Amino acid sequence: MPSVQKSLARLALACGMLPIAAVTADHDSSRWEKYIARFQAADKKQMPPPGGILFIGSSSIRMWKTLKQDFPGLPVINRGFGGSQIADSNHFAGRIVHPYKPRQIVLYAGDNDVAAGKSPETVLADFQQFVKTVHGKLPKARVSFIAIKPSLSRWKLSGKMARANSLVSDACGKDKRLDYIDIWQPMLGDDGRPKPDLFLGDGLHLNAKGYALWTSIVKPHLARRE
């Protein structure tokens, strides 16, 4: 879709004139095919039992190597693929979401979306489409959105990221099956900027201390089996 058409589409979306799927129709997810194939190969060897808690999204999920240790006693599944956007998780939902029949999906994405030039409104639209895709097959599943994190390397985009978080938070407040997990404020120091000691040397990805903070915030949001 040419850039002018994209702009018009986003305007129409904001006015409620366009289906949310239309904005992301031209997104190409093919670059992730080999990673998804690896997940499916692993599933053929040992399929996670249904009713688990699926973590999905970009590198902050992929690099969460201590996920199982951080949430002992909970059936967590890691299906993060680094560099991905919300639209990619939506595109592959039929292969790495629906088959697991999870009771909860914890999504971290949106960071790369904003860095790639997507507007906060488009981030919201993509999230809404992901939710629609999930609930089309799993109507009772809880979808939890981990807020886009503030980072040293992308601080210049913090205004757009905060706006996207606000939009998603508002949307989550309108559906009891949705959950917004705020990690934004806890990652900021007294100066209002990201705490450097939470990051690896690249100023983008989390270190062990960063994941420990996330664990403490995310844990109360995880759904135990009823």
Q: Model regions: which residues?
A:
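A short helix->loop->beta-strand "cap" motif at the edges of active sites that frequently abuts
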Residues: 138-142
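Cell-envelope and extracellular/periplasmic
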Residues: 80-84, 106-119, 128, 132-135, ...
